[in-house]
Design a protein with these regions (language model features):
Chain B
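Short, low-complexity disordered leader/linker segments with a strong preference
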Residues: 1-29, 318
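Immediate post-signal peptide segment of exported/extracytoplasmic ligand-binding proteins
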Residues: 22-34, 62, 83-89, 141-152, ...
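N-terminal (or domain-start) structured segment
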Residues: 24-112, 150, 157, 161, ...
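Hinge/capping helix and adjacent helix->loop/strand transition within the periplasmic-binding protein
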Residues: 30, 82-88, 101-186, 247-280
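Short coil/turn segments
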Residues: 39-41, 95, 129-134, 155-160, ...
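Beta->alpha turn/N-cap motifs
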Residues: 91-97, 155, 183-184, 201-206, ...
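A ligand-binding cleft/hinge motif common to bilobed small-molecule-binding domains
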Residues: 95-105, 162-171, 197-230, 308
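C-terminal lobe and pocket-closing loops
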Residues: 121, 205-273, 302-305
Length: 498, 318
């Protein structure tokens, strides 16, 4: 633990750096908690400010925002049922029902603790095993990437277990929507209907804001749901310590999923939480409780999205390859100072690398403390009369959908998906398969087509390459397993009704 | 009384509008937006921000960067084309503008825009793994001529790196396997992993990797050596006419008046003597590359035709 201890000491000894990281974490938590404003938005806005600071101080602010932004997402997800950021989509599924059942404090406490575990754990991995993992990455080719994506895509079947037809329809709808825009390889325009804005594809954030925020607000307001009675008392940790033990395997699994997905270039916390959630549901003894306030789901989602932070930092620091959209910005923040992350960064800038390690760990602690301090305060949001709360959220959603691309076309995407969300609710189609399909579809296509150009059109390497073959076997197993469980579930339902 | 007040307010309102019209005559008088056709954090964005910062100091009005990376820059171009030609909406783009048009991703030709100035250049290199037997560009060309379609060049389909590989094949008369390998950083990984034999890398990135002892630069695709890496030989001095720079160019909407073009262009021209500006560009791997409006116009037209010819020859023209 020597390296990490030194790194921590280095950060703590610099008061200005501590102030910056604290400021960053507060800004990050606020950005994370407000629907529509994400860690990426926060870091992008703060990036120009850091040009005037030295690289270490700049990183202090940005890393604070990054960790805060990913951590803060669970607050809105828990209290409003609206993911604060795409990193917390899956958190909504169980944290919101739990808080509606009058236990917002418990849900928040789990979110805060899980976030902390994810960040700290992944930082430790970053410090000690980054070069090892980075070397594994070099060995992976598009073949492995595409089978991995395929593997992840089979999780749609898990998410769709209760309603196979509707769930799969939703998943395929997501894949179809994901194909709008410029085709990944070959650069052909697809489904753009001659509209220039559509060549950019649909904006994920605008879509999520539509499906969750605008839809939720409109439906709640129309139904005039009563304000739930909430238990605001915080006792100890907010949840039983035994729960960590009960969820030990769930936490470890979600952590590894988050670390790995964060680490793969181009993916990040936004995908990690959905995959970890689907896995947790798939291996749970009580999958039927998922979506109705199961703490397991919150653990899975929140541990994995924060684990993706350390994961994404690994390729960025060791190879100069950003693991997600935020690390791409951090890379920019270093580049403007003439620092090019890559194999030389560790040798040339040991101080900077060390302070990044320390800053990540400190940010994790700061976020945990801030979340617990706010625990009595946050749930009061639930007691604000809807006619005050909702207009504010509405405005923030519009701001958020605009801010990610600086493009007003995204308003229409958001409003359209609010409608799509309502129709899907009426048809009892689950949302999660659609979002997973939307994110994974283009990634699978890109890597599959890239792999096929590498092999000049031959499909054989998918089976002959060992890692790829193993991943395919897992995918097949996961599909078969899902079908069996689906059948069993239907038989059970049929038995009940008979 | 109330009617009088209402008419008075109306008059004031109209006056205030005309006042702003009078104000507009003296350009610049309010915030200038630079639409950057790349996402925040990348090299293009960094260079756009540096230009914005120094323009602000020169012009005395806020200059802000707006990132619109959507559609590979099509969205940013569209925003500029549809903007009022008042000098308050500008576009920051490079060779991708031509690639986008010739491959059919965006239907309006970049020649419609008003060229203002080129600002900074990024030199591109053709690089290979340190373990490769090729020492010079000629080694590669001889080997590739003997083994057509054997060696893999990592590029991103429909992006500038794609056209760089075409320029190489065109000038050296060789056939390579062009494999899509994503963005620069991904390509580096694939080169290291042995899935690719050749990649395009910016001088800035290549310098780091050469120093780390894992990469060899065969040629810089420019007429002159890059001041940031004077050791790297150019393709031209090795006898191959491959010139392929990412020349960052500032455009205005169609029909931007000459007076406004001159104000911006003159402000940029002054930066040549500003050591701080040059140092900032060098830090992100860019070099000074200013051209006045006439030269920029000629340059843009020339690039446009060059990319168009390559697109046609290799069947990418849409």
């Amino acid at each position: 633990m020597l390296v990490l201890a030194q790194a921590l000491q280095m950060v703590i000894q610099q008061p200005f750096m501590m102030v910056l990281v604290l400021m960053g974490a507060v800004i990050g938590l606020v950005f994370g908690a407000i629907p529509g404003l994400t860690a990426t938005t926060g870091v992008a806005l703060a990036l120009p400010l850091t040009f005037a600071l030295n690289p270490e101080m700049g990183m202090a602010l940005l890393i604070g925002i990054y960790v805060g932004g990913i951590s803060g997402g669970f607050i809105a997800a828990t209290l409003l049922g609206i993911p604060g950021t795409p990193a917390s989509i899956a958190t909504c599924f169980d944290a919101y029902p739990l808080s509606q059942q009058g236990q917002p404090v418990k849900a928040l406490a789990i979110g805060a603790t899980a976030s902390f575990m994810g960040t700290l754990g992944s930082t430790i991995c970053l410090v000690y095993i980054a070069p090892i993992i980075a070397n594994i990455a070099l060995k992976l080719s598009p073949f492995e990437y595409s089978t991995l994506m395929f593997c992840a895509l089979t999780l749609i079947a898990t998410l769709a277990r209760e309603e196979p037809f509707r769930g799969l329809a939703s998943g395929f709808l997501g894949i179809l929507l994901g194909s709008i825009g410029i085709a990944p390889i070959g650069s052909t325009l697809r489904f753009t209907f001659g509209l220039v804005p559509l060549s950019a594809g649909l904006n994920l954030l605008a879509m999520i804001l539509g499906i969750f925020a605008i839809k939720q607000i409109s439906v709640d307001y129309a139904e005039d749901k009563p304000i739930p009675l909430v238990d605001l008392e915080v006792k100890g940790l907010g949840f039983r310590l035994g729960e960590i033990v009960d969820n030990a395997w769930n936490i470890v699994r979600s952590f590894l999923i988050g670390l790995w997905i964060g680490f793969l270039p181009g993916m990040g916390a936004g995908l990690a939480n959905l995959i970890a959630y689907a896995q947790a549901k798939s291996s749970s003894k009580h999958p039927e409780k998922f979506g109705k306030g199961a703490p397991e789901g919150i653990w899975a989602s929140e541990v994995s999205n924060n684990a993706a932070i350390g994961g994404a930092m690994i390729p960025m620091l060791t190879l100069g390859i950003p693991g997600d959209s935020v690390t791409a910005l951090l890379l920019g923040g270093l580049m403007i100072h003439g620092l090019i992350p890559g194999p030389l960064l560790y040798i040339k800038q040991p101080r900077l690398v060390n302070s990044i390690f320390g800053l990540l760990a400190i940010s994790a602690v700061i976020c945990l403390v801030l979340c617990y301090l706010g625990m009595r305060l946050f749930p009061r949001v639930l007691t604000i009369p809807r006619h005050y709360l909702y207009p504010v959220l509405m405005v923030l959603s519009f701001v958020g959908s605009f801010a990610s691309n600086n493009y007003s076309f995204d308003f229409w995407i958001m409003l359209l998906f609010a409608l799509v969300g309502m129709l899907m609710d009426m048809a009892k189609m689950p949302m999660s398969p659609m979002i997973l399909g939307f994110i994974l579809g283009p990634m699978l296509e890109e890597n599959l087509r890239r792999a096929l150009t590498y092999s000049a059109g031959s499909w054989l390497p998918f089976i002959t390459r060992p890692v790829s073959a193993v991943l395919l076997a897992i995918a097949v197993f996961s599909l078969v397993n899902s079908v069996i469980k689906m059948r069993r579930h239907q038989a059970l339902q049929a038995g009940k009704s008979a | 009384m109330r009617r009088l007040l209402a008419s008075l307010l109306t008059v004031i309102l109209i006056l205030s509008f005309s006042w702003s019209l009078v104000g507009a005559a003296e350009y610049p008088s309010s915030t200038i937006k630079i639409m950057v056709a790349a996402k925040a954090g990348g090299a293009t964005d960094a260079s756009g921000r540096i230009v914005a910062q120094f323009l602000r100091e020169q012009l005395g009005v806020p200059v802000v960067v707006v990132n619109q990376e959507g559609g590979g820059g099509a969205v940013a171009t569209d925003s500029t084309i549809n903007a009022k030609p008042d000098g308050y909406t500008l576009l920051y783009d490079h060779v991708n503008a031509h690639v986008r048009y010739h491959t059919g991703l965006y239907g309006v030709s970049p020649l419609e825009l008003t060229p203002i100035a080129t600002t900074a250049a990024v030199n591109q290199t053709i690089a290979t793994d340190k373990a490769s037997p090729w020492q010079t560009l000629d080694d590669l060309v001889q080997d590739a001529r003997a083994n057509p379609k054997k060696y893999a060049f990592g590029m991103q389909t429909g992006a500038s790196s794609h056209f760089l590989s075409l320029a190489l094949m065109d000038a050296a008369d060789i056939e390579l396997r062009l494999l899509d390998a994503g963005f620069e950083a991904d390509k580096l990984a694939a080169l290291r992993g042995g899935q690719l034999n050749l990649i395009q890398a910016t001088v800035g990135a290549a310098r780091e990797y050469v120093e780390a002892g894992i990469m060899r630069v065969l040629a810089v695709c420019a007429t002159e050596r890059d001041p940031l890496a004077p050791d790297f030989p150019t393709a031209v001095e090795q006898g191959y006419d491959i010139v392929f720079q990412s020349m960052h160019t500032l455009y205005g909407p169609p029909g931007l008046p000459d007076e406004i073009v001159k104000v911006i262009s003159d402000a940029l021209a002054k930066l040549e003597d500003d050591p701080e500006y040059i140092e900032k560009l060098h830090k992100i791997g860019h070099v000074w590359g200013y051209r006045n409006p006439e030269d920029t116009k000629a340059f843009v037209r020339n690039e446009f035709e060059r990319i168009g010819r390559l697109a046609e020859k290799f069947g990418l023209k849409k």
